[in-house]
């Protein structure tokens, strides 16, 4: 089916996610590993062409896949730089899902390199991006996997803030209803009756 989608955005996504899968398969040493590296480079080459023609749509994908190639090739300095570029590009072009993924992969990279403090920063940024994107289950998964690094759940904080905000809105609505009841009433008995209904 791939030959029918060459000129569609889905083909770029196919190459991006296909490249990520190849990087993971190569890292896990699924046999034989070398074809995965070769396929990753083919996917990357296609994304490079598209990123050159339309960076708004493809640059974040290309940079993130480039970072993954650098990671599995054993180039830690280049890997960290490319992750950062991918995050900045995703932020610039409003790819919140790719921003979350780039932060997550950068966090995993630093965690595996025993840089827990740096990993925490990236993983926390990933949580926020995923939450902004609406990927609640992904946030829960990250918090379960990296609970020792991330600490308190961001979902609990969000829930507490939502309850507090809801109570503040309810208080403001009560004040407005009371004010309207007093302003619109001509009879004190009706004002008292209306206030009792509001309460």
What residue spans do the PLM features occupy?
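Phosphate-binding active sites in nucleotide-utilizing proteins
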Residues: 194
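Signal-transmission linkers at sensory-effector interfaces
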Residues: 147-190
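Helix-coil-helix junctions within alpha-helical repeat/solenoid scaffolds
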Residues: 1-131, 138-150
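Amphipathic alpha-helical protein-protein interaction surfaces
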Residues: 115, 135, 184-187
